[in-house]
Amino acid sequence: MRKIVLLACAMACLATSCVRQGRLPRADLARTGIDTSEYHKVIIAVTSRPTDELHSLMVVKGGEVIYERYQPGFDAQSLKVLWSASKSFTSTAIGLAVGDGKLRLDDKAVSFFTPEELPDTLSDWLQQMTVEDLLKMSSGFKQDHVGRCCSGEDFDWAKTILATEQFFEPGTLFSYNSMNSYLLSAIFSRATGEDVSTCLKRRVFAPLGIREDVWTYSPQGIFAGGWGLFLSTESLAKMGLLYARDGVWKGRRILPEGWAAQVGAPQILQDPAGRNPENDWAAGYGYHFWT
């Protein structure tokens, strides 16, 4: 009996060690002398405004967590919806496909969809629209049809958005539209034969030690693309750190070289006239990343 208890304790310790191995290292604040009082002020400032929600805050410096705080009802294991930050994960998958040679940024979007999914008559602009246009939110689709696409289980999301009128020539103007992200997710699936979620779990999440995740799918079984990914605070921090290191994790290249810089560089201006350069919204948009 004693041997069984000792074995169980050893297995429990081993399991705990394995879980902790996936965590980012925590800084010794006494050793580093880092003052975290300003981060406390951020928490207080944000939570004092009834219109804002802050569930958690994690600050990473030099690869170490120097501050983390969770509001009541949340903890380090809580999975939180990333909303539009999910778009950056779709972009990550596109980058992997481009790096593998399975996609090109200048590929025509309509080439990945069946005649049944496309309008009976293809406009010049729809035929012109590329993967890159979708990435930088310049598809020509002005109206976001998320509500319409998600209003019933029978809707074919791709067919619905592709039938939508385009208001400007693709690649010329910025218009934020979450259905661009869904089209990218669908294109990725057609080009690679696997869903964005399957690819990222295998090629990105596994090496980063991200083990808990929840995804939202269309009725067609395709990741929503523009929203609907749930991760823990630390998992999101790991992705940020991966991009800060040009896609390299513990000496291993995860993302194609240069992709991190490419997605984070301004690819299009929200206001080409530059009428309000101090507005963060008009600071430029990358490949599904704000710059």
Where are these regions (language model features)?
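Active-site SXXK
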Residues: 63, 80-109, 134, 184-188, ...
